[in-house]
């Protein structure tokens, strides 16, 4: 369990054929963030770097829901994909620039 903006979220690993992983179009996905139950469902078949990427993506959704950030589904997916794919690189660059600025100051 974790909290974002005083909202408690839980993460559950579920079978890959769980109804919790069915999209609105009837297809299966590997991760799903349910704003109603404040639960993230992740396929128990995931591991390693892909599991981490899916967790980042779904936790990004939970942050958006917790802070009331409203976007179209397409925009929200693009944003969560951006953070899940490039977030480590962006934060690493910021950390390096921040350290360099502190050394100059």
Give residue ranges: language-model regions.
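Metalloprotease/metallohydrolase-associated module, dominated by Zn2+-dependent proteases
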Residues: 1-50, 66-105
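Active-site recognition of the HExxH zinc-binding catalytic motif
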Residues: 53-65
């Amino acid at each position: 369990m974790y909290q974002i903006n005083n909202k408690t979220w839980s993460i559950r690993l579920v079978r890959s054929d769980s109804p919790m992983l069915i999209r609105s179009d009837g297809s299966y996905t590997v991760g799903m963030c349910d704003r109603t139950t404040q639960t993230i469902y992740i396929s128990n078949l995931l591991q390693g770097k892909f599991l981490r990427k899916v967790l980042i993506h779904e936790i990004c959704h939970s942050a958006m829901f917790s802070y009331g950030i409203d976007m179209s589904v397409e925009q929200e997916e693009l944003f969560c994909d951006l953070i899940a794919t490039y977030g480590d690189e962006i934060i690493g660059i910021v950390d390096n620039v921040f350290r360099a600025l502190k050394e100059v100051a």
